[in-house]
């Protein structure tokens, strides 16, 4: 399947490598274009660790290219970038084209659903309680070190009538690791990433300021 990934950080690179290694065709989009510049010039995407992959991936020049002619769209940005990604994709999303939000925060799916309704577009919005994997992007601009691939990921779909379809798509793309939850509120409550990362960040600020290499697990 051809999958548009809106984002170009560690999670987006890791997901692209995961999908490509599984035989799918990811299309990465960097809103600024900076993080995909070398990939757009033909350098291979390389993943090491829990996901092993090296090869070329498609790069979209804008939001329209990232969404056009793909079987599904994945939002793989920090939560403060979700609205920008939604707005970039909105004019180009087609009825029935699934959108996966990895991971879901602040009921962004409701915003996307309401904006799509203004266009008369109905599609499944699939939200995750966390990301598929964890990792760190490397300074070379084309590599990612994948630390873990999660065994379980909570998932819910809007509208609820499309829940079975949403879970089936996720399993087809990413394997049998998804646990269906009742709805957006359950996903919001199960998403522990914001508060967990806040605590880690507060006690490691100087490491980040100095650009040190440090692992979250051993510095909690």
PLM regions and their residue ranges:
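NAD(P)+-binding Rossmann beta1-loop-alpha1 motif at the extreme N-terminus of oxidoreductases
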Residues: 1-48
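Short acidic low-complexity segments
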Residues: 52-70
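Rossmann-like NAD(P)(H) cofactor-binding subdomain of soluble oxidoreductases
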Residues: 74-75, 79-140
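Internal, well-ordered alpha/beta segment that forms a basic, Gly-enriched binding/recognition surface
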Residues: 117, 127-175
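Active-site-lining helix/loop region of Rossmann-like oxidoreductase modules
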Residues: 152-220
